[in-house]
Amino acid sequence: MTNIRKTHPLMKILNNAFIDLPTPSNISSWWNFGSLLGLCLITQILTGLLLAMHYTPDTSTAFSSVAHICRDVNYGWFIRYLHANGASMFFICLYAHIGRSLYYGSYMFQETWNVGVLLLLAVMATAFVGYVLPWGQMSFWGATVITNLLSAIPYIGTTLVEWIWGGFSVDKATLTRFFAFHFILPFIITALAAVHLLFLHETGSNNPTGIPSNMDMIPFHPYHTIKDTLGALLLILTLLALTLFAPDLLGDPDNYTPANPLSTPAHIKPEWYFLFAYAILRSVPNKLGGVLALLLSILILIFIPMLQTSKQRSMMFRPFSQLLFWTLIADLLTLTWIGGQPVEHPYIIVGQLASILYFLLILVLMPTISLIENKLLKW
């Protein structure tokens, strides 16, 4: 009798996606982040659901409802900090996953890559609206500053901002709709992740060498399931360590002060995972220019497959491209640091130089060095 996992309509889909899936034999641990992102998503949805049972999306009670979760709900503090730090782990995995794709040329699977960019934008939107919900000082002022950026759009800007706010300032209507968005977006992300996998399984995975994987494939289970389990255990260990020993390490102390529209915090800044984009936004003296630079800093990912000039897919055997890649990583870390600093000398000029270098590396230097490498190899 044929195994049920190969005949049952539902089991067959799962079997072809996670059990009998042909996988390159030589993929490294950098390929673990896809499954880790799935684990992060499940964790966030479960903890988020438990939090939503006790949270009230109303300006007068939101802050105290979060305090109530932490003080009075059984293990509420644990669920709340798992959710907050889970978001940080989500972004660490996301950035590692994107970095892997850039290094090994996985972006040449264009449909998978484009859905991935959509996923990144959806996760960023979810994290932003979620940060507003505790209704602390940084929640309120972060929402005010970021939504206000839309007013830079010519002609319709102001109307658009007031439409998103549901009034003339960030208030009760804004909080209610942000809670609605924060609840629905993870399910949209889940659907997009399924499409992302669908497109990936059409082509099969890339591998570190960048050459076609068809020559040497192994079944996903048990080889990569056991490997992914190790990654999952390390992720859970890190998340638990962060949650239990340093729950507020990545948060902002200002968010423990209830939102007050009459008092502006000294330094308004987003969570650490948005700081690089925030630094690019602040580096441009013009409001509309800053907003465009902010958008382009993320949307530039869409154009990366078009900027591929190398005859080799992966950077594994391209030392000059590797040097520029790690320069880009260092530049992003610099931007992240600058985003958390006040707007004063020397941070302003360092941020501007790092922003210019970011776009220069992606749009000019990396495609140029790839052409030079082709020449050196007489290709």
From Swiss-Prot:
It is a multi-pass membrane protein. Changing residue 193 to T: In strain: Isolate Pacific ocean. The chain crosses the membrane at residues 33-53, 77-98, 113-133, 178-198, 226-246, 288-308, 320-340, 347-367. GO terms for molecular function: metal ion binding; ubiquinol-cytochrome-c reductase activity. Binds 2 heme b groups non-covalently. InterPro entries: Cyt_b/b6_C (IPR005798), Cyt_b/b6_C_sf (IPR036150), Cyt_b/b6_N (IPR005797), Cytb/b6-like_sf (IPR027387), Cytochrome_b (IPR030689), Cytochrome_b_C_euk/bac (IPR048260), Cytochrome_b_N_euk/bac (IPR048259), Di-haem_cyt_TM (IPR016174). GO terms for biological process: mitochondrial electron transport, ubiquinol to cytochrome c. A ubiquinone binds at residue 201. Heme b b566 binds at residues 97, 196. The keyword Heme applies. Belongs to the cytochrome b family. This is Cytochrome b. It comes from Orcinus orca (Killer whale).
